[in-house]
Amino acid sequence: MNNIIDGKALANEILEDLKLEIQELKSQTNASPKLAIVLVGDNPASIIYVKNKIKNAHKIGIDTLLVNLSTTIHTNDLITKINELNHDNEISGMIVQLPLPNSIDKNKILSAVSPYKDVDGFHPLNVGYLHSGIIDVSEFSQSFIPCTALGCLAVIKKYEPNLSGKHVVVIGRSNIVGKPLSALLLKEDCSVTICHSKTHNLGSIALKADIVVAAIGSPLKLTAEYFNPESIVIDVGINRISGNKIIGDVDFEHVKSKVKYITPVPGGIGPMTIAFLLKNTVKAFKDSYSTVCHL
């Protein structure tokens, strides 16, 4: 169906542009962007995500460093390792793959990553800049915005260029998607309603929306009754079920024919998240050279 949004195709366009930009940057600086990925433990899903990030990074000319640590590592020891990467001038950007083991203080770890290398956009300084309205999606800003939120916004603007006044219902309040995306949509002059698992009358709220973003983490939770024929549906859910199959928060098979546009899972927002992670990494590289190379 032509109303199904091909996130992989959109992501590939971004990656091709980044590949050309990296080639130009390398000719100017004789260096390449480098992304450090800190992975604690051997969570199968995390390993798959990390491999995809590394594969796409190498495809466009971004070097990577994978730091794989044992689940027995203590919070302070992990912070020490992160500080080493903070002070490594070859590292442009850094992410800590989530989730972390329960024994590790996630907030301390995310705060330990230098805000200037925080290409996931999770450092409290970057979070504060976004929600205070100080920064926007401009690549001239020296702060970072969470990649999934950027990917969602890019998809939404592709299919609804004039967002001013649109009613967007964001279902989910995480720091990774719901909160940052809501902040970005407010900057686009949308009327944003944030819902979550405790929201009453969720169906009637979503039904009135122009755009619905599903990021609630509940497989196939949103059925056709939640949407109107003009709805644009962005499904951010990644839910693993039997046989390692991945499904979204939206009942895709029964919803796709009832709405204007919809993203599939997989193949929707996932590839866009990786594309914007790598875009943030290139931005971090340019920021680190800007004072001496005038990039």
Curated annotation (Swiss-Prot):
Positions contributing to NADP(+) binding: 172-174, 197, 238
Family annotation (InterPro entries): Aminoacid_DH-like_N_sf (IPR046346), NAD(P)-bd_dom_sf (IPR036291), THF_DH/CycHdrlase (IPR000672), THF_DH/CycHdrlase_cat_dom (IPR020630), THF_DH/CycHdrlase_CS (IPR020867), THF_DH/CycHdrlase_NAD-bd_dom (IPR020631)
MF term (GO), any: methenyltetrahydrofolate cyclohydrolase activity
CDD domains: NAD_bind_m-THF_DH_Cyclohyd
Entry EC no(s): 1.5.1.5, 3.5.4.9
Keyword Heme: no
Function text: Catalyzes the oxidation of 5,10-methylenetetrahydrofolate to 5,10-methenyltetrahydrofolate and then the hydrolysis of 5,10-methenyltetrahydrofolate to 10-formyltetrahydrofolate.
Family that this chain belongs to: Belongs to the tetrahydrofolate dehydrogenase/cyclohydrolase family.
The protein, known as: Bifunctional protein FolD
Taxonomic lineage: Bacteria, Pseudomonadati, Pseudomonadota, Alphaproteobacteria, Rickettsiales
